[in-house]
Amino acid sequence: MAHYLVTVNLSSEPDPLPSPAADPGSPLSPGAHTVAVRYGSSLIEQRYHVAGTGPVCVAHSGGPGIGWDYLRMPLLERHLTMVYIEPVGTGASGRLPDPRAYNLATYTQFLHAVIEHLALPEVALLGHSHGGFVAQRYALDHPARVASLILYDTSPVTGEEFWSAAVADMERFARRHAAGHPEVATYVAGLTARLDLLSDEGATAVLRTITPTYFFDYWGREKEFAPARGTLRMYAAPSAGEGPPFDVREELPGIAARTLVLVGEADFICGRRWARMIHEAVPGAELVVLDETGHLGHIEQPEEFATAVVAFLRSPS
């Protein structure tokens, strides 16, 4: 598929969003919106946030349990109406009565409720990390609703092999940086900690501690990245979710949407190995590898990230 030169506004500071939305009666009015989702006998509030202008792109953040706002993409908001999901169990969204129900089926159900509420026949869908698991499942279950799919630093499979590889990569990271940053000795324990046994504050502390691992060169650009690190929030309950290991490898040829796979070259957890699996299995998928980038390309290389996404969405099918 051809790429087109795209001019991206280089202002990367996000504009503040109204809460509630400027026009709560319009589902795409800028700001915060709430949808009541029927879940068993309960109605659970699902929050989402609208920013920007242009074609609609729904974005599902990672975790599970990480606050949505790390995924703000102000450069994309210059070209797209971004609809950011605030996943159930986090922030101002509701809480499930049973924490074990924070699983892929639940996240997919709540995502579908938002897309239905938008009243659009189809949308572009972007999923980051765990949000990419949700996006893959949604594109398979609701193919008619997804015009374009952007799978960003994610994987088609988890389970023992996936986590063993992530731990091994984090161990290598710790060895490389142990002399200058002795605190990295605690990082593997943080990655493998039972966050569901902690408070939200404790889970947040773990996430902020291991954050440098998610960057290509955190300490070399610490003045840039430290403010974002300090605003990260982790909610403990979603880590209690139960369900089978995620694995859609055999289903990927059934994805009908145009698909872009984006991956940071140095992503330790959802790196090129997993991105290539998706790229090779999804018919016609494109692969973009962001140089000198870890798991957070929209923060580390925002111009390159935004250019890749906008070029993909503007290119003819």
Q: Where on the chain are the PLM-derived regions?
A:
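Catalytic active-site module of serine/aspartate enzymes centered on a nucleophile-bearing elbow/loop
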Residues: 285-317
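Conserved hydrolase catalytic core segment
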Residues: 121-165
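Acidic catalytic loop of the alpha/beta-hydrolase fold
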Residues: 266-270
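Short beta-strand/loop motif that positions the catalytic acidic residue
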Residues: 255, 261-263
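Active-site loop/oxyanion-hole signature of alpha/beta-hydrolase fold enzymes
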Residues: 84-126, 130, 307
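Conserved HGGG/HGGXW glycine-rich cap/lid loop of the alpha/beta-hydrolase fold
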Residues: 39, 43-95, 100
